[in-house]
Amino acid sequence: MVDFYDELTYETNPFPETHPGNLAALGRLFGIQTTSPQQCRVLELGSATGGNLIPMAWHLPQSEFVGVELSAAQVDIGQRIVSTLELPNIRLEVGDILELDAARIGQFDYIIAHGVYSWVPPLVREKILQLTRDCLTPHGLAYISYNLLPGWRMRGSLRDLLLHATREVTGAAAKYNTAIAALERLQQALQGAAADSQHYVQKEITYLLAAHPSYLLHEYLAGENNAFLFSEFLADAGRHELQYVCETDLHTLFDTTLSQPAQTALADIEDPLQHEQWMDFVQMRAFRKSVLCRADLPLERAIDIDVFTAYFYSANLRLKGKENLNNTKPVLFLTADNNELSVTHPL
C-alpha cells in the first residue's frame, strides 16, 4: 500500500473537527476536564504530509505535535514544510503503526486517526486502539473516523464497480483514468433512473468525478476498505478499556435530526448508545467521527445547557438579506449549508 501512496500522495487538508480546541470543548460538555489546547500534546496516526497537523502547530506554538506516517515520501514533503516554517513544536516521522512503542512516544492529551481505521487490516485496527489506551493521558481524548454500516453498503457498490473496472490496470494514473471512465459510463447508464438507490449512486458519482484524484484512489481502490456497525466499533473500543464520548458533529446525537415518525418509533429506546445505533439504521449513515476516552473516566451524559455559557463560539455565516446591524432586532444569518440562524446581537 505504501508504494501506491508514494506514487500519488494523499491530499491532506486541515480537518477542523480534529482540532484540540474543538475536542477539548466537546469533552468539557460531558464533564471531562480536558487539557487546554494552548498547552497540550497531540499525536496523529496516519498524518500523511502533515496538512492537518502543521496548521495546528503554527497556531498553537506552546503545544507539541507528533505525526506518524507509513509513507516516507509523504513525510519528506511534510518535513520540508515544517523546516520552511521553522516550527520547533512538531515532529513528523516515518513509522509503521504496528511497530510503534507507547513507552517511546509517550502520552498525549489528544490522539487523531482520521481516514485510517477503515483502511487498515484488523491487526492495525487493534494496535490503534491499544495505542489509544496506552498513550492517552487520564483526561485525554481520541478522535477516530471510520466507514459505517449500513450506509456504506451503498457506496461500497461503487467500490465494487471501480475494483472490477481497474482489476487489470497498473499504475496510479492509469487506474484513476480507468476509474473515471467507468464512473462516466455508469453515470450515462443511470440517466432517467427512477429508484432512490440509483439517485444516491448518481449523487456519489458526481462527487467522485469532482474530487481530488487521491481521494478516489485511496478511498475506493485501496486494498483495505472496511465498514462497521456503530455497536461493533463500541465493542472493539471497550475491549481496549476505551469508552465512547460523542461525535464531533454533536447535533447527530439528538433525535431532532429525525422525522417525527422516526422520533416516535425510537422513543422507547432508553439506552443512548442503542438509540444512536438505531438512528444509524434509520438515516443510513455511512461515516462517523467518534470521540473516545479512557473507560475509567466518569462521564456526564446529560448535557447541562449552562455549560455553554463558558465558551466562545465562531461560525462561517453570511447575512441573509440586507438587515440593519445598527439595531437590536434579531437578524438572520445563513450557515454554509443554508440553515438559518437568528442572532439577537449580531455585532
Predicted feature residues:
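Conserved alpha-helix/loop element of class I SAM-dependent methyltransferases that forms part
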Residues: 7, 11, 15-40, 55
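Conserved SAM-binding loop of SAM-dependent methyltransferases across substrates and taxa
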Residues: 49-62
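Conserved SAM/SAH-binding beta-strand->alpha-helix loop
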Residues: 71
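Conserved SAM-binding strand-loop segment of SAM-dependent methyltransferases
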Residues: 86-97
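A short acidic, Gly/Pro-enriched loop at the edge of an enzyme's catalytic core
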Residues: 102-111
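A short glycine-rich, Lys/Arg-flanked "PGG" loop and its adjoining helix->strand segment in the class I
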Residues: 126-138
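Conserved class I S-adenosyl-L-methionine
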Residues: 144-171, 175-178, 182-193
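Rossmann-like AdoMet/SAM-dependent catalytic core
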Residues: 194-347
